[in-house]
A protein has these predicted regions:
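C-terminal helical cap/extension that packs against the catalytic core
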Residues: 339-400
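Beta-strand->loop->alpha-helix junctions that form or flank phosphate-binding loops
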Residues: 2-4, 20-23, 59-63, 104-106, ...
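Short internal beta-strands
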Residues: 1-3, 179-184, 320-323, 344-355
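N-terminal leader/targeting and accessory segments in enzymes
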Residues: 1-60, 64, 234, 242
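Phosphate-binding loop of NTP-binding sites
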Residues: 27-29, 38-184, 188-199, 251, ...
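Nucleotide phosphate-binding/pyrophosphate-handling subdomain across enzymes
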Residues: 219-221, 229-347, 371
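A glycine-rich beta-strand to alpha-helix segment
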Residues: 389-420
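Structural beta-sheet core signal
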Residues: 103, 144, 182, 202, ...
C-alpha cells in the first residue's frame, strides 16, 4: 500500500500487483509478512499495528533486502553519492559477463526495461546499500564498494564522525575471502582507510589507485578514458554517460568485474551499452534547441558533479539550473555548501524545500540557499518559493541554445517534462 499513486505503483499494477492507496488494517488479510519502509512508523501505522496484533512478522525493508541477498554471494554498493549508478553499472557488467546476477537498485534502470530489479539464476546478488537510517548495516556483503563518504543524513547520525563510523562497521561485515573496493580520490575514504581491517582494493584517478583512469575525454553524452589496472594498461572505455564522477562509478564496476574474471573487453562493451538510470543526468530531449536534463542531485557535491558534467559536455550552451532543496534538515545543515555549488551554472533558480518525511523548520527555506549563492558571488540567482510559479519564470529566462537542468530528489522532475512537451 502507499498513500498515493506514482509511476512505481502504476508499473507494479501493470504486472499484476494489487496496490492499495491509503493504509487500513484490512489490507494485511492473508499476509505472511508485512514489510515497511523507513518512512513508516510501525507503532502508528494501522497495517503494521494490525500485523503485530495478529502475530504476523513485520520487518523493515532493509531487513528484507538482507534476507534476500544472503541467499547468494552479495556485492553491496555504498557511499554518500553514486550508489544507484554504480549498482546499475555493476549489475550490467555481471550480466554481460555471464554471471546472471540478481540485481536490486534504488532507481529505475533503463537496461532493465525501466524497473529497479531483476531476478537472476546465478550465485551473485548486486544490491544498493543505503546508509540512511543505518539500513546498510543489515547486509553481509561478500564484496563491498564504498564510493565516497561525506556528512549526510545528519538528522540520523548527528555528526560526520558518526557517518564514518557506520561505514567502518559496514566494511567490517565483509568476510576474509571478500574485499572492500574504495574510491581513493575521496577525502572521507582516505581518512577511513586505516580503520578498515579487510582486504582493500582502490579505484579512482590518483596514481596510487589499483584500478585507475587516465586520458579522460568528455563528450556531450559520453566519456572516454583509458584504464590502468595494477600498472598495466588494459584499454579504452567509451562510457555511455557523461561526467568525471561517472568515470569513478564505472571504475568501481571495472574493479569488481576484473576480480570476478570477466574479460576487460566484455566490461568495456557493457559500459559502452549502458542505458543510464532514471533521473541520473537523464537527458530528456530537445525543445526548440533547448536541451532538457533532469537529475536527482540533492547534496552539494552532487549538484557540483551534475553541473560540471553539463559544463564539460556542452561548453557552448548557457546552463540554466533549477534546484528544489530536499528536506528541511539537509537545507539547514548545508545551505552554505549548497550556495557554493552553482559555479558552472549561468543562471540559477531555487524553489522552496520539498519536505519529504519532515515537518517544516521555522526559518529554513530555499531562500537560505539562494542568499548563500549570492553571498558567494553568483551573479544570476533567483528565488522562486512557489513551485507553481517556477515554470513561467524559467520560460521567461531561457532561450534557444540553452541547457536547462532540473535538480532535486522531490517533484521538480515534473518541470522537466513540462518544459520538454510545451510548444
Amino acid at each position: 500500500s502507499d498513500l498515493s499513486a506514482s509511476q512505481n505503483t502504476e508499473y507494479l499494477q501493470s504486472i499484476g500487483a494489487v496496490i492499495h492507496f491509503g493504509h487500513h488494517e484490512a489490507h494485511i488479510d492473508n499476509a505472511e509478512v508485512v514489510v515497511y519502509s523507513s518512512a513508516v512508523k510501525p507503532n502508528e501505522n494501522p497495517e503494521t499495528m494490525a500485523a503485530q496484533e495478529h502475530g504476523i512478522p513485520i520487518i523493515r525493508r532493509a531487513e528484507m533486502l538482507a534476507e534476500i541477498s544472503r541467499l547468494n554471494y552479495t556485492l553491496a554498493i555504498a557511499g554518500t553519492h553514486g550508489k544507484t549508478t554504480t549498482t546499475s553499472l555493476c549489475g550490467l557488467v555481471l550480466m554481460k559477463g555471464g554471471i546472471d546476477p540478481t540485481v536490486i537498485v534504488g532507481g529505475r534502470l533503463n537496461g532493465l526495461g525501466g524497473t529497479n530489479a531483476r531476478l537472476g539464476k546465478g550465485e551473485w546478488t548486486v544490491v544498493e546499500a543505503d546508509e540512511y537510517d543505518r539500513s546498510f548495516l543489515q547486509l553481509f556483503p561478500t564484496i563491498a564498494i564504498i564510493n565516497n563518504i561525506e556528512a549526510e543524513h545528519l538528522d540520523i547520525y548527528g555528526t560526520a564522525e558518526e557517518v564514518q563510523k557506520a561505514f567502518i562497521e559496514f566494511s567490517s561485515k565483509v568476510p576474509f575471502y571478500g574485499f572492500v573496493a574504495v574510491g581513493l580520490d575521496d577525502a572521507g575514504i582516505r581518512s577511513m582507510l586505516p580503520h578498515i581491517n579487510k582486504k582493500v582494493v582502490t579505484f579512482g584517478l590518483s596514481r596510487q589507485c589499483d584500478i585507475r583512469a587516465i586520458d579522460i575525454i568528455p563528450h556531450e553524452r559520453s566519456t572516454e578514458f583509458t584504464v590502468i589496472a595494477h600498472g598495466e594498461k588494459l584499454g579504452v572505455v567509451h562510457l555511455n554517460i557523461p561526467g568525471e564522477y561517472n568515470v569513478k562509478n564505472a571504475l568501481a564496476s571495472i574493479t569488481v568485474g576484473l576480480h570476478l574474471g570477466i574479460p576487460f573487453a566484455t566490461i568495456a562493451e557493457s559500459l559502452k551499452e549502458f542505458g543510464g538510470v532514471y533521473r541520473r543526468f537523464e537527458i530528456k530531449g530537445m525543445n526548440n534547441d533547448i536541451l532538457i536534463v533532469d537529475d536527482y542531485a540533492h547534496h552539494p557535491t552532487e549538484l557540483k558533479s551534475a553541473l560540471s558534467a553539463a559544463r564539460s559536455g556542452w561548453k557552448e550552451r548557457r546552463i540554466v539550473a533549477v534546484f528544489q532543496p530536499h528536506t528541511y534538515t539537509r537545507t539547514r545543515d548545508f545551505y552554505k555548501e549548497f550556495g557554493l555549488s552553482f559555479d558552472d551554472a549561468d543562471i540559477v533558480l531555487i524553489t522552496d524545500v520539498y519536505a519529504a518525511r519532515e515537518q517544516k523548520i521555522e526559518g529554513v527555506s530555499g531562500e537560505l540557499i539562494a542568499q548563500a549563492a549570492k553571498n558567494a558571488g553568483h551573479r544570476h540567482v533567483h528565488y522562486v518559493p512557489n513551485l507553481a510559479d517556477i515554470e513561467s519564470k524559467v520560460r521567461g529566462l531561457m532561450q534557444a541554445g540553452d541547457l536547462v537542468i532540473t535538480l532535486g530528489a522531490g517533484d521538480i522532475t515534473k518541470l522537466s517534462d513540462s518544459l520538454l512537451s510545451a510548444e
